Amino acid sequence: MYAMVVTVNIAAGQLEGARKALQENVVPQARKAPGFVKGYWTAAPNGKSGTSLVIFKTKPDAENAAKMAGDSPAPPGVTVTSVEVREVVAEA
């Protein structure tokens, strides 16, 4: 399995809007992606950043999702700072 790891910055006052966009757009799109297994989206305690870990069956699936994530417009107040594909090497 492979993970797409995305890190974002969230502008002041935009956390609720970012969460709404996440629930209404990002998560449903991720679920439909080829090879999707599971996804986790996290927010920093201060609400200024977030990190997601989305698991895919194959490296090409994760790479395609990463390309889409990098090419898609972010919600207002959200800036994508990194998109990486990593191999899942252990699971508990």
Q: How would you name each of these model-derived features?
A:
Residues M1-G50, K57-M68, V78-A92:
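Short S/T/G/P-rich N-terminal loop/turn motif that feeds into the first structured element of a domain
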Residues A69-P73:
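RNA recognition motif
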